[in-house]
């Protein structure tokens, strides 16, 4: 058995280990019983709404997957079409599994908070997040290794494997856009009518949109985020393997083996790190989660050093891996600087809210723009270091390094919406106030980890898209026997740059408009219920929660189609015209997409935590004050920024890159 075959078997084995670890955490969650009927009723309603959304979304996506697979089979190859279908199915399974456990963990976290305080509640919420994290990387590693093994056995080209990444990317985009529209339509509707107009607290059971709001936390922040990082994870490995086979070396085997082994040991590191996240007295929750992430990173660096030595590769490759990993941690740190409660940036938003909503919005936008500086410098330094030490392959392996700890990052990130849901369930079930106080502490940490997760997703998207772009260039070079030169003085390249730069803004406009349209429907429905059922406010009548869930589901699925199709159609049209123009388009979209994504994510995070800071008594103000009402408006503007448009841009730049890579054989025929 040769080295590469051994590595693929290792990948399959580690993937299975990761899935078994996810199963262990799922059983930990299920160990806690929901013994309060009201909690069980609300948990079941949230689960039913979340799974109904996924079922409706997948019905639409099945048609899309079949159409694209047939086109790939006709114009590229049948194996590419098969890999595309497998990528789509695997991404859907990962999202479905994460959603199922998250909608079990939420009610159990509320019960744990009531019976065991912060320590037990953290245990349940984090276990729910760990299931998502370890499922994402376990499925990714298992399926990718299996496909590579089968392709070697039957003699299929590695280029066909890129279809797997395209399938994962396609599902990820629709999951992010659809989930993002759903969650923010419900959130904006619940906030504007409930908090601002009716003056009732967040998650109050009298608010008709409150169940839809809690369903949205799962479809957007669990399934959507998991699909996003799943796509980055497999995309970075595929890009690196593609580049490895195109390297001018006698034996590409160690270069192909490196990303698989590094990712496999990253999974082991993540599993070990998840075991360290526990607290006996409920103190220092944020510190425990941060420590777990750092442990995963340190273990991965140590393992990577051994792997590079074992494979006999140049140490420059190791330095590129470290550059990627460190860049991920530094970007996460700077995200916290601009979005954490108590930090200067968030204080600026809270202060600005004192003079009204307009000044709060202006300050948030300024913070978002300012927050792009440090992450972009970090990404630029990581790119330069990795290129100097390993060439284009170095940039790709840096992306693999950054994403090696995805299991732990997703676990920490997915814990947030579980904790948020637990607070909502506690409020709606009218559990004792101290239960809500406990879940609020977890949720406050969850907001910070979610912001950090978004920063990580953006940074990893930048490196993954760049590595896919490099693979695209090398693939064109190989098929045309001449170097593809992306010269900025070439009119075709300039045209592509402008179109790519514009796509970011068009895509953001479409997703923001979609949230606005869906939110208007939600606001009108909530107002109608308050108007026609006056007994809701004095609790003598029950709101129609199901109607609000139906509105969010229908609107989000209808509005997600155009942005999703746009991301695939535009690179195809430009690529058929000119491979140089397509190169320019990918470069233009990469630059503007990363900048816009960071700005939107951090502005939204600052508005969100600025509002929460006021709710905690900032400068003597509290819920219902003029300062708080202004901050709620800012947070409402920030909701589609940080949870719909911003995160969707990550996938836009990656999907266009991998579509371009997969379709290179078609494009060169038209040159």
UniProtKB/Swiss-Prot annotation:
Its cofactor is Mg(2+). It is an enzyme of class 7 (translocase). GO terms for biological process: sodium ion transport. The record marks 450 as: Determinant of potassium dependence. The record marks 176, 221, 228, 643, 654 as: Important for ion transport. The keyword Membrane applies. Substrate binds at residues 184, 642. It catalyses: Na(+)(in) + diphosphate + H2O = Na(+)(out) + 2 phosphate + H(+). Its EC number is 7.2.3.1. Requires K(+) for maximal activity. Sodium pump that utilizes the energy of pyrophosphate hydrolysis as the driving force for Na(+) movement across the membrane. This is Putative K(+)-stimulated pyrophosphate-energized sodium pump. It comes from Fusobacterium nucleatum subsp. nucleatum (strain ATCC 25586 / DSM 15643 / BCRC 10681 / CIP 101130 / JCM 8532 / KCTC 2640 / LMG 13131 / VPI 4355).
């Amino acid at each position: 058995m040769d080295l590469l075959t051994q590595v693929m078997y290792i990948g399959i084995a580690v993937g299975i280990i990761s899935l078994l670890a996810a199963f262990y955490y799922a059983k930990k969650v299920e160990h806690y019983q929901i013994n309060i009927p009201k909690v069980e009723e609300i948990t079941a309603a949230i689960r039913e709404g979340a799974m109904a959304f996924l079922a409706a979304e997948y019905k639409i996506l099945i048609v899309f997957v079949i159409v694209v697979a047939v086109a790939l089979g006709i114009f590229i190859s049948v194996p590419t079409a098969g890999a595309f279908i497998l990528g789509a199915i695997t991404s859907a399974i990962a999202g479905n599994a994460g959603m199922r456990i998250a909608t079990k963990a939420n009610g159990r976290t509320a019960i744990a908070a009531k019976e065991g305080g912060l320590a037990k509640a953290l245990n349940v919420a984090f276990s729910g997040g760990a299931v998502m994290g370890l499922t994402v990387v376990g499925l990714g590693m298992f399926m990718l290794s299996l496909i590579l093994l089968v392709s070697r056995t039957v003699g299929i080209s590695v280029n066909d494997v890129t279809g797997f990444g395209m399938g994962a990317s396609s599902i990820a985009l629709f999951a992010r856009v659809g989930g993002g529209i759903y969650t923010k339509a419900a959130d904006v509707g619940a906030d504007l009518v409930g908090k601002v107009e009716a003056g009732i607290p967040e998650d109050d059971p009298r608010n008709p949109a409150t169940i839809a709001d809690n369903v949205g936390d799962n479809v957007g922040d669990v399934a959507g985020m998991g699909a996003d990082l799943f796509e980055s994870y497999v995309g970075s490995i595929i890009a690196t393997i593609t580049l490895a086979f195109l390297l001018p070396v006698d034996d590409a085997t160690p270069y192909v083996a490196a990303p698989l082994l590094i990712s496999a040991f990253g999974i082991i590191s993540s599993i070990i790190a998840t075991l360290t996240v526990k607290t006996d007295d409920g103190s220092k929750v944020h510190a425990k989660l941060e420590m777990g992430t750092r442990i995963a990173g340190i273990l991965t660096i140590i393992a990577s050093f051994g792997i590079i030595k074992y494979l006999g590769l140049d140490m420059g490759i190791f330095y590129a891996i470290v550059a990627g990993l460190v860049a991920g941690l530094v970007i996460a740190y700077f995200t916290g600087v601009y979005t954490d409660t108590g930090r200067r940036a968030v204080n600026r938003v809270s202060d600005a809210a004192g003079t009204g909503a307009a000044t709060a919005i202006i300050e948030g936008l300024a913070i978002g723009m300012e927050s792009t500086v440090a992450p972009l410098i970090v990404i630029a330094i990581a790119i330069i270091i990795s290129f100097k030490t390993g060439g284009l392959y170095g940039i790709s392996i840096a992306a693999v390094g950054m994403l090696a700890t995805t299991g732990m990052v997703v676990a920490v990130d997915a814990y947030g919406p579980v904790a948020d849901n637990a607070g909502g369930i506690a409020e709606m079930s009218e559990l004792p106030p101290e239960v809500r106080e406990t879940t609020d502490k977890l949720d406050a940490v969850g907001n910070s980890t979610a912001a950090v997760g978004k920063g990580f997703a953006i940074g990893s998207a930048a490196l993954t898209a760049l590595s896919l772009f490099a693979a695209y260039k090398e693939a064109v070079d190989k098929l045309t026997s001449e170097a593809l030169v992306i010269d900025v003085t070439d009119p075709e390249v300039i045209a592509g740059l402008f179109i790519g730069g514009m796509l970011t803004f068009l895509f953001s406009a479409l997703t923001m408009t979609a949230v606005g349209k869906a939110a208007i429907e939600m606001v009108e429905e909530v107002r109608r219920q308050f108007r026609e059922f006056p007994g809701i406010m004095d609790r003598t009548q029950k709101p129609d929660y199901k109607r609000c869930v139906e509105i969010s589901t229908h609107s989000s699925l209808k509005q997600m189609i155009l942005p999703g199709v746009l991301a695939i159609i535009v690179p195809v049209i430009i690529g058929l015209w000119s491979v140089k123009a397509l190169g320019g388009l990918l470069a233009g979209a990469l630059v503007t997409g990363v900048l816009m994504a960071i700005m939107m994510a951090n502005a939204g995070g600052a508005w969100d935590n600025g509002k929460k800071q006021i709710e905690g008594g900032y400068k003597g103000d509290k819920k219902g004050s003029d300062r708080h009402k202004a901050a709620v408006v800012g947070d409402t503007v920030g909701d589609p920024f940080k949870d719909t448009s911003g995160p969707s841009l990550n996938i836009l730049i990656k999907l266009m890159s991998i579509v371009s890579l997969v379709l290179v054989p078609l494009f060169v025929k038209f040159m």
